[in-house]
Amino acid sequence: MHEISIAISIVEIAEASARKHGARSIQLVKLRLGEFTTIVQEALEFAFEIARQDTLAAHATLVVEIVPMVVRCSSCGVIPNPVRDIILSCPQCGLPLEIMAGEDIQLEYIEAETENIAWSV
């Protein structure tokens, strides 16, 4: 379960940013998770509950936004629906598709106790 190491990294990054801004605690961590990652959302949420203990994020809420996978043909530019079509090559020209979105994880922002200001990480 690699979600625990990812959750620990998320907490460490959020905590470092919060400390840099003089925060005493973190209330919210907003995450964008690509649907084409190998990360299981429920496992990540469970791992976050463990990873946040005894940190500035001890009482933080994790909000996960799922980013849909978007693919595009680098040759002809066609953007098919990868979930509906379940394809690895362009339906128009047959060349391989390149993934444009939905295969990464991004810590979008955190909210901390200092004046309830949210800032990007």
Predicted regions and their residues:
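Internal catalytic or translocation cores that form aromatic/hydrophobic pockets or channels
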Residues: 60-62, 71, 80
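Flanking scaffold residues of small Cys/His-coordinated metal-binding clusters
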Residues: 67-68, 84-85, 102
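Short cysteine-rich clusters marking metal-coordination/redox-active sites
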Residues: 73-76, 90-93
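Long, charge-rich boundary regions
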Residues: 106-121
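Short functional micro-motifs and their immediate structural scaffolds
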Residues: 81, 98
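Cys/His-enriched microdomains
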Residues: 71, 88, 105
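Long, charged N-terminal interaction/targeting segments
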Residues: 1-59
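Short loop/turn motifs enriched for small/polar and acidic residues
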Residues: 32-36, 65-69, 108-110
